[in-house]
Amino acid sequence: MQKLFIVFVLFCILRLDAEVDGRTATFCTQSICEESCKRQNKNGRCVIEAEGSLIYHLCKCY
């Protein structure tokens, strides 16, 4: 059971570091998202998107 948990955690870490359609899949924090988008002179917003059976909390700049 512990091995399965470790594999799951490693998978999540690697998956969260991967690029998804040009956006980084992370657990989005609104304040951090707004700050990173402010550098691009855009408004930032956390959105939830699904890809297959996986759900991503993404920061999108508009």
UniProtKB/Swiss-Prot annotation:
Endpoints of the signal sequence: 1-18
Coiled-coil annotated residue ranges, if any: none
A GO cellular component annotation in the UniProt record: extracellular region
Entry annotated with the keyword Hydrolase: no
GO molecular function, one term: potassium channel regulator activity
Disulphide linkage map: 28-46, 33-59, 37-61
Tissue specificity field: Expressed by the venom gland.
Keywords for the protein's UniProt record, in alphabetical order: Disulfide bond, Ion channel impairing toxin, Neurotoxin, Potassium channel impairing toxin, Secreted, Signal, Toxin
Entry's localization field: Secreted
Site (Basic residue of the functional dyad): 45
Aromatic residue of the functional dyad, annotated site positions: 62
Function summary: May block potassium channels.
Similarity field: Belongs to the short scorpion toxin superfamily. Potassium channel inhibitor family. Alpha-KTx 22 subfamily.
Record remark: domains: Has the structural arrangement of an alpha-helix connected to antiparallel beta-sheets by disulfide bonds (CS-alpha/beta).
Name assigned to this protein: Potassium channel toxin alpha-KTx 22.1
